Amino acid sequence: MFESFNVPGLYIAVQAVLALAASWTSRQVGERTLTGIVIDSGDGVTHVIPVAEGYVIGSCIKHIPIAGRDITYFIQQLLREREVGIPPEQSLETAKAIKEKYCYICPDIVKEFAKYDVDPQKWIKQYTGINAINQKKFVIDVGYERFLGPEIFFHPEFANPDSMESISDVVDEVIQNCPIDVRRPLYKMEQIPLSYPQGHGFHPLSPPFH
């Protein structure tokens, strides 16, 4: 690589450390540090990764089987229950698009329900899709799904009655498993960059996050 492409230099870094550095661009992050908890959520699994002074504490990493795919399935289920007129063969694709475009994490689910009930015109969005068979447009209202989808991280029982361990519990467990001298800094600087999905509202979370 260096000889063929004349690359002047190369720096290899751990993704979790880079995620912490990237979180510095958020207004919610006060102090710039490479100590914190990184939640790396992909399509099928979510990892909780403790980082202390730029070093990943590998022995304390935990994972949970809730990730982006589960949010999509849950939103799909919510839309089906409302019978909003989505073509059946496009329900999964529509749920994924709604997740990536409209979903966000809320600090208080009860207050969020109240917001939508008091002023639905302000919070309910409309999604427009094209029926793949007849090429006609279909429009659906997107309401509670906007925050209920990501809420399964904190209330996994919403999507699966057998899943009882929330992301909050896992984060606390990960920190408690870390060396005692880094626990306080981890709790203090708990910044959680969600790497998936890259939709509106998926910003670093600061404590208390649920």
Swiss-Prot record:
GO terms for cellular component: extracellular exosome. The keyword RNA-binding does not apply. Expressed in kidney, stomach, spleen, bone marrow, uterus, testis, placenta, skeletal muscle, mammary gland, lung, fetal liver, and fetal kidney, but not detected in small intestine, brain, and thymus. Expressed in low-metastatic lung adenocarcinoma cells but not in high-metastatic ones. GO terms for molecular function: actin binding; ATP binding. It comes from the Eukaryota. Gene3D superfamilies: 3.30.420.40, Actin, Chain A, domain 4 (3.90.640.10). Keywords: Actin-binding, ATP-binding, Nucleotide-binding, Signal. The keyword Transit peptide does not apply. Residues 1-21 form the signal peptide. SUPFAM superfamilies: Actin-like ATPase domain. PANTHER family: ACTIN. Belongs to the actin family. May play a role in the suppression of metastatic potential in lung adenoma carcinoma cells. This is Actin-related protein 3C.
